[in-house]
Amino acid sequence: MSKTAIIFPGQGAQKVGMAQDLYNNNDQATEILTSAANTLDFDILETMFTDEEGKLGETENTQPALLTHSSALLAALKNLNPDFTMGHSLGEYSSLVAADVLSFEDAVKIVRKRGQLMAQAFPSGVGSMAAVLGLDFDKVDEICKSLSSDDKIIEPANINCPGQIVVSGHKALIDELVEKGKSLGAKRVMPLAVSGPFHSSLMKVIEEDFSSYINQFEWRDAKFPVVQNVNAQGETDKEVIKSNMVKQLYSPVQFINSTEWLIDQGVDHFIEIGPGKVLSGLIKKINRDVKLTSIQTLEDVKGWNEND
């Protein structure tokens, strides 16, 4: 029996003009976009549509923008009926909305706070991330341990697909790895345009503040399993999910294991909802046999709704 998972991208997928095609052209999507504008303490629609102030790339704005775009697309889609959901890093919050663990309004407040805490904890230039291409996890882990010291660390942060591991930590060590990457055996080491050492143990400094903030919202058991970044398996219990969302701040994203877990459950169709096709590209490198669908635009929504 064929099974479907809906999946959601994380930071890096944002672009100016995102979701503008949905606004005023689809009632369900417009409702989500308007709700975001009414819930947040900044003009999110201006930031998403025109970004005249150049603030879309700041993590406290990027995070609610991506959640809003994915949630608007999700609201516009008919007859989805997924068996599972999964998101990459920030995208996991879109999966929580999809599975009704959090209301959209609560989720958008949470990711705004998550971004603010991340930005405050690490002023620009302290921490960073880079993608290591052409090495397996064990080798990357070994390199990270050899570069780290008592006062500076670098760690695997996103285990994305075979031959692509993202590392995170102090910028000085990220820069060193970028410089030495080829001599250490990597095909390439590419610095990422992010403002902090996300998914590394350095993020533990915000654990307490974030945990106490998210406790004030209503969390519900998931309507269908959410495959979590931290443990790469489906969860439905609200307390387990909430605890894992705190751990997610400072733990690696287990994307390969999560995808393989879903395939083991019988999933043969992944539907990526949100800007870009990054996750579809990763999944193709994990398993070439599964079906991949990308829903990014109003046209994609219309195509799905007409055909399904």
From Swiss-Prot:
Assigned keywords, A-Z: Acyltransferase, Fatty acid biosynthesis, Fatty acid metabolism, Lipid biosynthesis, Lipid metabolism, Transferase
Catalytic activity: holo-[ACP] + malonyl-CoA = malonyl-[ACP] + CoA
Pathway connected to this protein: Lipid metabolism; fatty acid biosynthesis
GO (cellular component) term, any one: cytosol
Cleaved signal peptide residues: none
EC number: 2.3.1.39
Name under which the protein is recorded: Malonyl CoA-acyl carrier protein transacylase
